[in-house]
Amino acid sequence: MTDSDYTVIMPFFNEENTLEIAVTNLVKEDFASEIILVNDGSNDKSYEIASSLQNKHKFIKLIESKENKGKGHALKLGINVASKKFIGVLDADLEYSPNDLKNLFKEIDINNLDIVCGSRFIGDFKRDNIYVRTYLANKFLSMFFSIIHREKVTDIATCLKVFRKTLFDSIDLKANGFSIEVEILAKTLSKSDYFKEFPISYTARSYEEGKKIKLIDGFR
């Protein structure tokens, strides 16, 4: 694995069908020198898979929460132990591409930014299977967020983000669930104006396939 200033946090809950593929794809991209897997109380074989991956790769750390407390809780656990200059987040469900995350890291590093968020609604990138109601709700929330925080944001619900680690020294994250996506951006933007969105691809999975985030999470 490359020697870089990049940490990737991958929270997971009951992702036995995708976790190994997600981590393997991330490792192949060879840009993160620290990968933190956070088990959010899985009751399938996810933890065993993660443990095997940790044993295989010395740059992988594994954190376990015995109870399922939510993505926000898992992210906070990962942030607390991250040791690199920049922190990125990648879900284990294969909806987002690790290659896109690599591009976000390059963007934040080369241009001396503090926050870079992937957006599914700029550029000509692939966007498969997005529910119409999800798209419309996201557009409304993004517009509302942009007005409140005086920063144009086109994809408030994106789960692909990169931050300068020092931002977390002066903010207190409260959310334990999926509303962390909105809170983490709102609070980091309050500490920095060096923000940019970057186009990314996206392949949505259905609720039958294990999708967990719901429309209501954006309003919490």
Tell me the role of every PLM-derived stretch:
Residues 39-48, 94:
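A conserved acidic beta->alpha catalytic loop
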Residues 152, 174-176, 185-203:
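Catalytic donor-sugar/metal-binding loop of nucleotide-sugar-dependent glycosyltransferases
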